[in-house]
Amino acid sequence: MGSHELFHAVQAGYAAGQDLIVSEATAVWATERFDPTLNDFEAFIRRFLERPERSIFVAPSGLVDGYPYSVSLFFRFLDERFGPEIVLELWQQLEQTPDVDDWVASVDGILSANYGTSFTDEYEQFAVWNVYTGRRANPTQAYQEGARYPLVASTDAELPLVLDRPRMFAASARYWRFAPGNRETITADLAPTDDDTEGLQLWLVPSGVNATMAPIKVLDQTEVSTEDVESMMLAVINPLQTGSSLRPTVCVGSPQEVEACKANAQPSDGGMGDDAGMPDGGDMDAGGSPDGGVDPGPPPETGGCTAHSGAPGGSLLWLLLGVMLWNRH
């Protein structure tokens, strides 16, 4: 039996018939965790990093497009933050609440009870970590193996930048990349509108010649120095686990440019605005799509569950894992 399928068998011993996303995502996470020589994890997470604007807990309504498998990146994040035991704790919690089809609420409860944090706080950190992938990897800031992961999709932009009401679904993020030019500092802020933007978070991540630097959360127009900075990423994050999508107007540039942008902002007219939030001439990096929400796509090239088979060493590790989980069960 392949390692992926063996973990499904272990899942069934705890709580059969769970949400497709949590079932497939934790199975892919486990395959990578116990047999990192396989390439399934890196192949699957590309789908997530190509579409960070999708809500992490909403599965496609049509054919499975690989997105449920790609959410394994979130469980890798939790593993690196809190250790692999958190996945076992999740399945134990799902066993205790078999009639509750809400794995995000279960994760939130575990984080609150056992780790002193929340899904909202951790999703925000997760979205920031995803900047540190591919050539922007920095293990001092995020994933230890981030250099092996695909780049998160981002949009090329020029300053000053006005993002006109991009749709921000619950538990999703969007990214823009720009050069600071001759500005000494860069900041960002939400422009006043009639739209509810409570809970939305803004982060700036500067990059220098040799490394992507520490991320900076923008609070009250925090000014970020551009000294030794070649480029910068803006992460707009909706970390909320429930609620309708948010439609912010975001101003980015020097402090003076941001103040002027906010002064010129008009309350929304109830229209849809620029759903992509993409400036004229913007280009997506890493093959991402600016469209929000969920849509069916082609099946992943690596296939579904039946495509996963581990090396003999991995199968042995999985057998030991299954026995360990079953004994604790």
List each language-model region with its residue ranges:
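Ser/Thr-rich, Pro/Gly/Ala-heavy low-complexity intrinsically disordered linkers and tails
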Residues: 266-322
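Zinc-dependent metallopeptidase catalytic helix centered on the HExxH motif
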Residues: 1-50
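Residue-level detector of buried hydrophobic side-chain packing
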Residues: 27, 75, 305-307
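Active-site-proximal alpha-helical
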Residues: 50-133
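Short, well-ordered loop/turn and helix-capping segments at boundaries between secondary-structure elements
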Residues: 12, 32, 36, 80, ...
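Generic detector of solvent-exposed, compositionally biased contiguous segments
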Residues: 32-64, 161-165, 207-221
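C-terminal membrane-anchoring or membrane-association module
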Residues: 321-329
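Beta/coil-rich, acidic/histidine-enriched accessory regions frequently appended to metallopeptidases
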Residues: 97-279, 284
